[in-house]
């Protein structure tokens, strides 16, 4: 993320400057992985338009398009895309337009919205991040139509076990 963002990648060599040069590190890393273990074992994740701390990209469409078009020919196994908080940036459609591998999408889905996204061909698969943390039995809950436990945002990305290993399995009448 830091290499792709123009506000943090202030390098003046071949790895900084325009979107193509900022993407170079990611491109070379993916190329090396594909060469070493094969494209079928390599996937990568992007989060266009998602700021983190002071890292943001003022032109995430250009940066993302540039990266995806550059690595399209590598034929990686999958691309995992996190939705942008700014809904004017449709990260999933951007990925579909500029990359042609299996697309895994993440947008804080609930089971019903995940199903809708797959039916609408927004992605080939969905991922559950936060809900996976707060539901150790996520698969069983979804399959059984049981409600998902809410996650505690205060415990995300913190040290220790609290919020990671202390959520209970679903129980009837709980």
PLM features: residue spans?
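Flavin-dependent oxidoreductase catalytic cores
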Residues: 1-174
